[in-house]
Amino acid sequence: MALVKVKPTSAGRRGMVKVVSPNLHKGAPHAALLEKKIRGSGRNNNGHITIRHRGGGHKQHYRVVDFRRNKDGIPAKVERLEYDPNRTAHIALLCYADGERRYIIAPRGLEVGATLISGIEAPIRAGNTLPIRNIPVGTTIHCIEMIPGKGAQMARSAGASAVLMAREGTYAQVRLRSGEVRRVHIECRATIGEVGNEEHSLRQIGKAGAMRWRGIRPTVRGVAMNPIDHPHGGGEGRTGEAREPVSPWGTPSKGYKTRRNKRTNNMIVQRRKRK
């Protein structure tokens, strides 16, 4: 992968930085692993907006990614690496020895032709998946399950990883990129290495239209609204916020804790670092 700074041939391309990956497959994705994707545009089942600034964008197919990696003991060959419009990471198409094909999140350094395997006897090599009880302490991992057999839920985005810190009884401690240390059951599976496409965070979109292609709509400032629309709205001429920054519903937007999931508090050993 390489970063390419685009020549400023127009105002929209000035400052644009692209991530170029010449090793990605240029053809169509594997048709058997595609599903129809219906855009909700940030609406719930009642048609009410639950996530603002969503809508439009290019049509996409959903790529069915294998987050369970439960074909134990069967080697799989990497057929190709592909772009996935639904996530920041790239995906890899695996062809198993029995002929089945599955997509996985492509780890850093994975090459076409490599052989991957999952299970308790899999070697400690990037892309292989094992239960956490079989992974050495200090290993860098990604695609971590939170409930055994449910499928990977943590460390799945581009460049993400975690470190296996310790094992105590039936639980292990995993340190995430945010600094949070979390307890995970040792029967949960994780993949060795870190997620690829680590330069994704260095790209510069360049123009608003590119965000519209991705289904992201403009964000309007609260101070530019009317008082009925936002707590910061109203006033004669240009005015400041006149109060602490809040959301449209009055919730403080600077450092206010909104976590409600008390059920899993006992799984967090150390809170994430404050920015």
From Swiss-Prot:
Domain of life of the organism in this record?
A: Bacteria
Give the Gene Ontology MF terms in alphabetical order: rRNA binding; structural constituent of ribosome; transferase activity
- GO term, biological process aspect, one: cytoplasmic translation
Disordered as annotated region, ranges: 223-275
Basic and acidic residues composition bias: residue spans: 229-244
Coiled coil (residue ranges): none
Keywords, in A-Z order: Ribonucleoprotein, Ribosomal protein, RNA-binding, rRNA-binding
- What exactly does this protein do? One of the primary rRNA binding proteins. Required for association of the 30S and 50S subunits to form the 70S ribosome, for tRNA binding and peptide bond formation. It has been suggested to have peptidyltransferase activity; this is somewhat controversial. Makes several contacts with the 16S rRNA in the 70S ribosome.
How is the subunit organization of this protein annotated in UniProt?
A: Part of the 50S ribosomal subunit. Forms a bridge to the 30S subunit in the 70S ribosome.
Recorded family membership = Belongs to the universal ribosomal protein uL2 family.
Name of the protein in question: Large ribosomal subunit protein uL2
**What species is given as this protein's source?**
Bordetella avium (strain 197N)
